[in-house]
Amino acid sequence: YIENGDITVKASGTEGKNTVSQGNKKDVEDTNTIITGTSNENTVTIDTSKGNVDVTFDDLNIDASSRKEAAMSVTGSGNTTIKLDGDNHLTGGNGSSGIDSIGSLTISGGENDSLTAKGGSGADGSGGDGIHSGSLTIYGGTVNANGGNCGDGNYSDGGSGIRISSHSLTIYDGTVNAKGGNGGDGNYSDGGSGIRSNGSLAISGGTVNATGGKSGGG
């Protein structure tokens, strides 16, 4: 349960196994990692430096506004697979992403499963991205990704709904709604992109709605 403290999930180096840490429980071996519950202060960290990590989000609700960091952070070059079960909500803190991953991320779910990832609004800077990842693959479920609104700083923009920093965004099935955050009142403040990719974009199925945020008044 996320309300019991920050959760860290690491690839154990053995296929199909993770090690999970929370509070006084350190590196507990687990073959079916399910994260559930509600918290306004605790976050999830996933470490794929030793291999791939599979987790299930079961009606998970995290609002990291008080922490000023991503609700879920992923380190390492391995792949993280998130299986959705029920309705899940991840909100990043000030200027931070809902989900921030430097490696590859895979999201899957059924028709009635969903993930809403929101970037935090920037106080005097840019808003956070809903989902920021090196690469992202979506196999099903409903994924709502909303960029955070920009603050009042100059040259600051709204966050992207989905931002791919290096590789690819691939959508096979499901419904994806991506909306950029709005620009602020500072000079040269633009709205964020619904989807922003520095790599390739491939859509072979499902429904995709991408909307950019409004530009600011400066």
Predicted regions: what they are:
Residues 1-218:
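A composition-driven surface/loop motif
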